Amino acid sequence: MKRLKLLTFIGILFFTNSVFVQGQNITDSKGMKQGAWRKLDAAGKVIYEGQFKDNIPQGVFRYYYEDGKVRSELTYSPDGKKASAVNYHPNGKKMAEGVYAETKKDGLWKYYNERENISAEEYYTKGMPVGFWKTYYDDGNLLEECPYKNGKKDGLSKQYFSDGSVKSEVNFKNGKYEGSARYLFPDGKPLLVGQFKDDLKHGLWIAYKANGEKESEITYFEGVISEEIYYDKTREAELKNEVKEIPE
């Protein structure tokens, strides 16, 4: 299953390197921003507003949707290098929260759906994905957990059915499929079991029916089929066409 991609479109847009000077905004003789600053769109609606001191953002910066509702709030540290961020859905519910360190996500970031249920948890070190990332179903139940190392998936990744039972267990190394993989039916019985090598199927892959009987055995060499055995002759042609795709 493709990992859910949620709420990442805001991020770096909110830092001072995206500020555009308006006529009413003040710079001193050294060209440094001072005091209240505000950016307006062509219709005169506020895009963001905040305070500067010696070119350093101070306190709370607010960003707005076109209808005037708050889109995000960033609260800066005194030196302007860190900012605690809260982003909002158009309905006013919290969308995301976390910290920026020098314009990069840092530490734990949490994301929420419009019902205020948790939808994802991500960890960063200076913008680099690390630690266990988690995504959730709309009701807040865990959908997937995947470890990251140096910005890439690394280790055992698990997906779950909505009732909490395991749906799949797959290993990654340096961002690629590597090692054992298994995909399960909701009752815990195996659906598909095999191995990966350098992001490709390698070795024996066994597919099962829901009753536990073997459906096929397919042997791969670096992603290329070298041998096929089908136990259900009535579905042999169909299965050959499918080659038992990895479940989403």
What are these regions (language model features)?
Residues 1-25:
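Bacterial Sec-dependent N-terminal signal peptides
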